[in-house]
Amino acid sequence: MGSTAPLRLPVIDLSMKNLKPGTTSWNSVRTQVREALEEYGCFEAVIDAVSPELQKAVCNKGHELLNLPLETKMLNGNKPEYDGFTSIPNLNEGMGVGRITDLEKVERFTNLMWPEGNKDFCETVYSYGKRMAEVDHILKMMVFESFGMEKHFDSFCESTNYLLHFMRYQQPGKDGRSPALSLHKDKSILTIVNQNDVKGLEFETKDGEWILPTADNHIVLLGDCFMAWSNGRLHSPLHRVTLVANQARLSTSSFSFPKDIIETPAELVDEEHPLLFNPFEITELLAYCFTKEGAKAVCDLKQYKAYTGA
């Protein structure tokens, strides 16, 4: 018998021509998005809102940022998860640029890293962040429509912040596969990742199998906050990064987070779907992730509920 073909994530075309609300193509993509987020919690996305030139430019800016002296990068340290400088020596380092759709905030971050200014960095990451936030907005709109929750959409989006995160992984120095980022779930609403042509991201299915998406497309994944909002109808997937020898990697990830409280709408609670999570604040969830209990639980929202009664 032949070998079983490797599992593949759904590939969804998010080209702007398909993203006009009310059209047949919109409705088709909306169905695909809902089904993928229910079954896998993630999918590969063909996105033309960001040109190859802009994607390459923002990747270069990520390297430029992470090439700064350690003492400079530490000026943006001691921040919540994703927003700030993090480093695991000889493995990876990352930096988040918060409030990426607010030009004034991006300028402030840029001036912190480069007191003499760096207009090109500021303009590039702001442009990229805005375009990715637009895609994120469209995806959330599709999800809300699919649940018949349009009346809650505007207030939900008004309570959303966007963040751009660069993560650079050192080239493994040994043969075979090498773990580069441990198993975890994102705490975001949505995350949109670009691997910049180097594979590494892996997702665990509900059945315990592993899927390795291609490095050709963006990858959209659902975070615990959106899972909680949906009352468990959407799936927040476990994932990790594993690299092979002779491959360095830099990823760019666009996150959307609630500004404060995440709460399940009453319309999504019924006898068949009892309330899974009480309202909780994102800052408290992120703080839990850094406790001993949170680290042991791969920062899982269900363990957070048991720990806090949320």
From Swiss-Prot:
Binding positions for Fe cation? 184, 186, 239
Which positions in this protein are listed as binding 2-oxoglutarate?
249
Q: Which residues form the Fe2OG dioxygenase domain?
A: 159-258
According to the UniProt entry, what is the EC number of this protein?
Answer: 1.14.20.8
Database matches in Gene3D superfamilies: B-lactam Antibiotic, Isopenicillin N Synthase, Chain
What is the purpose of this protein? 2-oxoglutarate-dependent dioxygenase involved in the biosynthesis of etoposide, a chemotherapeutic compound of the topoisomerase inhibitor family. Catalyzes the conversion of yatein to deoxypodophyllotoxin. Can also use, to some extent, demethylyatein as substrate.
Protein name, as recorded = Deoxypodophyllotoxin synthase
Say which species the protein is native to: Sinopodophyllum hexandrum (Himalayan may apple)
Organism lineage reads as:
Eukaryota, Viridiplantae, Streptophyta, Embryophyta, Tracheophyta
Q: Which gene encodes it?
A: 2-ODD
